[in-house]
């Protein structure tokens, strides 16, 4: 599968007199239809990276290729039309008096025909389960509902790429999981490419690959399973240790023969049943 995004030795500084660059020779790619999670401590360069991809910032050196085109000042708006951004606080994105108006806003700015706008808005709201809230004021929605509307606004633009900048961090665990599953379903149905900046284990677990950033550089890329198998190192990377990994580690320390590495709760349940049946 070909890369839809590629960064080659990208360097960026916010200030000329910085002792260390914000990004220092960052190189990685994102495949078409892939879900890539980007993790790392605050200040590691995560948000700077996605702002460079969206053309909100300009690299000092290196190159960024999006959907086969080198990102430049002359084509930045064309590139942005291929990318939908969803931020941590959806209130900062709302501009419409109603949910319907807000989702339609970007489409109206593109000069799309009224009937097409109506069809796209209805379809996008249906995808995120918010079709019954069309006439509601965004300010009266819950945090999870607001994020669903923000995602609908992005999806209605028919982008090839969705970027989530800690989009689930302000939600409760239940709302967070529901939103992640909604995004996954949309990604699977429409072959969207998803990049998510996150500290949430459920979000990381659903991704295809995980990119770890540290001090403005790429520390590693791996599958979620490979990342979770790093055990106590996860704390240093800004993640908690998954519950199932902690259970496996404790069982191994007690001498029980159980497979090492990350297991889902269902996989752990199966392993425990097999272990008990042999006792």
Swiss-Prot record:
Its EC number is 7.-.-.-. NCBIfam families: ECF_ATPase_1 (TIGR04520), PRK13635.1 (NF010156), PRK13648.1 (NF010167). It is a peripheral membrane protein. It is found in: Cell membrane. Belongs to the ABC transporter superfamily. Energy-coupling factor EcfA family. ATP-binding (A) component of a common energy-coupling factor (ECF) ABC-transporter complex. Unlike classic ABC transporters this ECF transporter provides the energy necessary to transport a number of different substrates. Keywords: ATP-binding, Cell membrane, Membrane, Nucleotide-binding, Translocase, Transport. ATP binds at residues 40-47. It holds the Pfam family ABC_tran. Forms a stable energy-coupling factor (ECF) transporter complex composed of 2 membrane-embedded substrate-binding proteins (S component), 2 ATP-binding proteins (A component) and 2 transmembrane proteins (T component). This is Energy-coupling factor transporter ATP-binding protein EcfA1. GO terms for molecular function: ATP binding; ATP hydrolysis activity; ATPase-coupled transmembrane transporter activity. PROSITE patterns: ABC_TRANSPORTER_1, ABC_TRANSPORTER_2, CBIO. One of its GO terms (cellular component) is ATP-binding cassette (ABC) transporter complex. Residues 5-240 form the ABC transporter domain.
């Amino acid at each position: 599968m070909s890369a839809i995004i590629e960064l080659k030795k990208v360097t960026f500084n916010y200030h000329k007199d910085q002792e260390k660059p914000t990004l220092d020779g960052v190189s990685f790619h994102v495949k078409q239809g892939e879900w890539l999670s980007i993790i790392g401590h605050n200040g590691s360069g995560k948000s700077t990276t996605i702002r460079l991809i969206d053309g909100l910032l300009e690299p000092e050196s290196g190159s960024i290729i999006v959907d086969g085109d080198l990102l430049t000042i002359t084509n930045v708006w064309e590139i942005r039309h291929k990318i939908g951004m969803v931020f941590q606080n959806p209130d900062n994105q709302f501009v419409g008096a109603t949910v319907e108006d807000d989702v339609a806003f970007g489409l109206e700015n593109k000069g799309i025909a009224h009937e097409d706008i109506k069809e796209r808005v209805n379809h996008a709201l249906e995808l995120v389960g918010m079709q019954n809230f069309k006439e509601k004021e965004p300010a009266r929605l819950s945090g999870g509902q607001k994020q669903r509307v923000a995602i609908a606004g992005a999806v209605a633009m028919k982008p090839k790429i969705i970027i989530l900048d800690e989009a689930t961090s302000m939600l409760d665990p239940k709302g967070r999981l529901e939103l992640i599953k909604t995004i996954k379903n949309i990604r699977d149905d429409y072959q969207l490419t998803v990049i998510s900046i996150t500290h949430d284990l459920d979000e990381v677990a659903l991704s295809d690959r995980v990119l770890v950033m540290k001090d403005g550089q790429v520390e590693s890329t791996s599958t979620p399973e490979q990342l979770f198998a790093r055990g106590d190192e996860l704390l240093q990377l800004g993640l908690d240790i998954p519950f199932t990994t902690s259970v496996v580690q404790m069982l191994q320390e007690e001498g029980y023969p159980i497979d090492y590495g990350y297991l889902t709760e269902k996989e752990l349940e199966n392993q425990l049943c097999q272990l008990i049946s042999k006792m």
